[in-house]
Amino acid sequence: MPDPLTREDLQQFIDANAITATILPLDAHTATVEDAARVLGVDTIQIIKSLLFLVDGEPLLVINNGTARVDRKQLAGHLGVGRKRVKFASADQALALTGYVVGSMPPFGHRLPLKTLVDPAVTALDTVYGGGGALDAMLRLTAAELLRVTGAEVAAIAEQE
């Protein structure tokens, strides 16, 4: 397997595609959404997760609010498939398909272009923070820029409380 992509690779992708986004280096890995929000001084709702699923073996990136869980039944229904056909990608599969280590995965700039869904709770925000291409980095951008760059479809896929 090739070496994992890095935040430098992400920065090159940002520069090459004229994306308005900033990679924020951190002093240490923030293992939880709460840690990331505290270190960045933002609300936990602004932290986003980029999660890789396999739908009948095909990769699908799902971007969700960091404090919410993806409802696989709802996701499957949106895609028009049975829930059992939607699997969460393993860490090895995610690395192979995106190039990034789980916990550092940005919402774009992957090894392969990925079909992407974004939950409306994310698009309702102005500024969001996601994986920055390294365990000790976060990416800051607007939700509008996130949608523009990913070409994502907005779909309600978060578990409702």
Task: Identify the role of each PLM range.
Residues 1-161:
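Extended, low-hydrophobicity, polar/charged segments
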